[in-house]
Every structure is written in C-alpha cells, then in structure tokens.
Regions:
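Bacterial N-terminal signal peptides that target proteins for export
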Residues: 1-7
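Short secondary-structure boundary segments
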Residues: 6, 21-23
C-alpha cells in the first residue's frame, strides 16, 4: 500500500472516546450548564431500551463522590424514573449517562427553589459527595 493510501485509511478511521475522555466531555458540558443555569437533555442508563424519552434536567451541581465517581444533581422535569415520568430533585452517575446535550429551557419555580437551598451532598443521612466541583 502506498503511503498516501495508508494516510487516507488512517484519517477515515472512526474515533472512539475512552471512558475517561467521555466522562471529561460530560463533566465539561454539565459544569457549563450548572454555571450558566442551563437545562440539558440526557439519555441515562437503560432509558432507550425501555422506550423512555430523554430526561430533561435543570443542572444544579456536579460533584465528586467519596467513591471516586462523578455525579450530577439537579431538577428532573421529564424522564422515566421507576417506571413513571415525574418531577423531582435527582442525582445521576456519570458512568451511566449515555448522552448529554444542552437544550433551550428555563428553570421552573420548584427547581429554582431547590437550587437556591443548595445541596450538601447527602440523600437523607447518606452523605456521599466528597466535593462539589461546580454549581
């Protein structure tokens, strides 16, 4: 194979992100959304196989857990949770986020209220966030 054919073959190869690169890309998008008060649409875990629409999340904070996992905390206004679609504060692990995109939208009153109260990194008495990375 001539060198210019080899170069063309290399250029056309698809690029696959490693889990670390994908997590970094997700963190960048979610931190930007948290800092700018933006809404994201995310595909989480097995949502697609369940026939669920992408989740809509007002991003409040991104944190690093005691276990080394990254998490996003915010207000879900649409999405399958335990087989039903409802609004509530939610936490999502980065390693289960399949896709995330910033979308047009504004925080509703309940979401703004939840964000203004802040988050201590706990769910009930289970405090598992070591550090809030951005909000």
């Amino acid at each position: 194979m001539k060198l210019h054919h080899l170069m063309a073959a290399v250029v056309l190869l698809p690029v696959h992100l490693s889990p670390v690169q994908a997590q970094s890309e997700i963190e960048t998008k979610l931190c930007e959304a948290a800092r700018n008060g933006q809404v994201v649409e995310l595909v989480y875990d097995k949502d697609k196989s369940k026939g669920c629409l992408p989740r809509i999340l007002d991003v409040h904070q991104v944190g690093l857990g005691n276990n080394g996992q990254h998490y996003v905390h915010g207000w879900q206004s649409r999405g399958c949770t335990k087989g039903r679609d409802y609004e509530s504060k939610r936490i999502f692990r980065f390693d289960k986020i399949k896709q995330v995109e910033v979308v047009d939208g504004t925080f509703g009153e309940r979401s703004q209220d939840a964000k203004s109260k802040g988050w201590d990194g706990c769910i009930g008495s289970n405090c598992f966030i070591a550090e809030i990375l951005c909000e």
